[in-house]
Amino acid sequence: VARRRFDVSSVHERRRALRSELTAGRRLVGTFVKLANADIVEMAAAAGFQFVVVDLEHSTLTEVDALGLVRHADAGGVPALVRVPAVDPPLIARLLENGAVGIQLSMLRTAEQARRLMAATHFAPSGERSVSLANRVAGFGATSLRDFLQLEAEAPPLLVGQIETGIAEPWPDVLHGLDVAFVGTTDLSVNLGLPSIGELSAAVERVRLAAEAAGVAFGGWSASLSAAPAQGLAEAGYLVVGSDLQILAAGLRAALSPEGGN
């Protein structure tokens, strides 16, 4: 019986494409997905967002929800990263096996956190991730172990570290192995004691300069594309704009305002 060819996930192609854009200094714009509805992923892509970040930190999404969103994004060719609140190797492995292009880690403070993130997302000898071919990214076994390991070595997951506190350790050590140093301005402001706009801007600039010196892309979150420069994100190559919840809530409020809803 002739076997029907199975088109495996093209997640490695999407990783290469995103990394190429970041390396070339071209801006990528995405949004957070906090609702367990696959239509959100499609709407984001149709609106022109270049990637989505499925949010397992500030949302009610379960792991099952996140896996469903990642698989839907993968099947539709939409690059999907997943934001996680901590390095959880088994969870990270399942997310990557189902088509996540990368992992975005909240509250990155230390070089040890960065090392554990690298270990959880890379196979030996550069990491400690457990290997399985029984998943969509490996074609459920249609890809050989040797070929799969080569694909992963050539196009590893994108790694984004969120800088949301003061950093006491040397920046190069904390940012080692990352693709993006992502400044979380809200948590950074709170952790710095709600500083003045000037003081916060200086803190954001320190992250940008550290990213530049370490050879990684600079990124951050903004409520809108137009608001990014005022937050010190004019040069952000990896920009996450709003979220599905934020955009929906703003639209609902606008629909009830005398000037909105047209």
Can you name each region flagged by the protein language model?
Residues 40-68, 183-199:
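Glycine-rich, proline-tolerant flexible connector loops at the mouths of alpha/beta enzymes
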Residues 63-97, 119-127, 151-154, 196-220:
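Alpha-helix-loop-beta-strand connector modules within alpha/beta enzyme cores
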Residues 42, 46, 87-101, 105, ...:
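Catalytic cores of alpha/beta
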Residues 34-36, 57-59, 85-87, 108, ...:
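Active-site beta-loop-alpha junctions enriched in small/polar residues
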Residues 2-30, 142-155, 206, 212-213:
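N-terminal amphipathic alpha-helix/helix-capping segment at the start of soluble metabolic enzymes
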Residues 69, 73, 111-127, 245-262:
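C-terminal helical cap(s) of enzyme catalytic domains, especially alpha/beta-barrels
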